[in-house]
Amino acid sequence: MGSYRAEAQIAAPAHRVWNVLVDLDRWPVWTKSVRKMRRLGEGEFGLGSKVRITQPGLGTATWVVEEWQPNSSFTWTASLPGVRSVAQHRILPVAPGRVKVVLTIQQTGRFADLVERFYGKKIERYMRLEAEGLRRSLEGT
């Protein structure tokens, strides 16, 4: 089973961080870990939404939002043959106008160990890119 985590302290209130996280069209602007992100379907992004994400060197996967707590967290899952990925995005207040963003991915299934062996370092690096890119996009640094 692969387990990955990245976090960043961000000088911004939770609602601003949330607004950047749920603006799917902008992800390729603030993180190099995402080449393309496209919402499948109509309506607001939220519980049950499906998103197709293309990442350099990892290919394309469809993620489904399974948990949704506005201004706080969302969890989406993707399943490929032999591997199920569960990715959580949490925003934790640490002080007025300051939060800690915690990103986690858990991978399970018959081929999870192989994915970790061949792609684990890349997944870790991409998670750091996401956490730091989010911080930079909000702090302007």
Give the positions of each predicted feature.
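Solvent-exposed residues in well-ordered beta-strands and their adjoining turns
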Residues: 9-13, 54-56, 92, 104-108
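Hydrophobic ligand-binding cavity/cleft-lining segments
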Residues: 1-42
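Alpha-helix boundary recognition
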Residues: 22, 28, 66-69, 92
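Hydrophobic-ligand-binding modules of eukaryotic lipid transfer/binding families
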Residues: 1-8, 125-128, 132, 140-141
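Glycine-rich portal/gate segments that line the openings of hydrophobic small-molecule binding cavities
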Residues: 38-86, 96-98, 132-141
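Short, intrinsically disordered, mixed-charge
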Residues: 19-29, 120, 132, 136-139
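Beta-strand/loop substructures that line and gate deep hydrophobic ligand-binding cavities in soluble
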Residues: 77-129, 134-136
